[in-house]
């Protein structure tokens, strides 16, 4: 597939019916097996919740007012977390602010320990805007592949004036771009290919994984997300374990679990765009010595081979591998349509 991801053709997404809300998995319908049950798994920040959000938007699953409120809170948090990460990166870099006043502004941002889940004060909003618009900060941002930064940082920072309004309501695009960690177990029921599906999303942090086994019964297919761009990053839980290694080990454990011996796995290799951007700055071979070099396509092929190796001796008919950008709605519409057709075909 390579790194050319733009799609020019206009998608014709069929009219789809969906249930009203996301509910904890414990609140299942009276007949839990009346739907094709899908389990969405992956490490934290792998993009799996973005996949769930795409399903909700593409398959007409509307958000409630409380869900908008919840996501709006995390958008403010995303903005502050991003500007704080950029300020810290600036402090560690060889770049100086073009406007010296921004150095003091950045120091105050770094020292601010509040989570900021609501409207910014006028003073804080101005600080963020001045820092973000500094010419030197834009030079630093061009190096973003060298440090851990939310993919949506520029999107939200460029829209801070719109977002920092009392009557702000997130757009569909805002909902997709926001990083909102999964709390507990959520599920959505929708209809595709004349079949009723129920998709479960479970938190991907290590502390949440003990809950996974509670959802294993009666699962018809697994969606597993891996953010391949994280080959150089470590997990926030211990600051030691490589994120990609953790994801591959997790995939291997799922593939080897007797409960899923005959369950098809749909593997989403996510963040292909970020991965390609990183390669020229952070060599893949530094973290994966078995990679002998080549172009971006060779690197992506290598990552796919790693994932297939993690699947072990699983029959080829029991897994599919897709390369994707989870925040790209058009790409995900095409991908999900293909996946749901394949699952529906298996169930006939």
Curated annotation (Swiss-Prot):
Where is the stretch described as G3 motif? 197-206
Which residue(s) hold a covalent lipid per the annotation (N-myristoyl glycine)?
Answer: 2
| Name by which UniProt lists this protein | Guanine nucleotide-binding protein alpha-13 subunit
According to the UniProt entry, its GO molecular function terms are: G protein-coupled receptor binding; G-protein alpha-subunit binding; G-protein beta/gamma-subunit complex binding; GTP binding; GTPase activity; metal ion binding
Report residue spans for region: G1 motif: 37-50
| Lipidation feature positions (S-palmitoyl cysteine) | 3
Can you tell me which family this protein belongs to?
Belongs to the G-alpha family.
Which parts of this chain are annotated as the region G4 motif?
Answer: 266-273
Residues annotated for GTP binding in this entry: 42-49, 176-182, 201-205, 270-273, 326
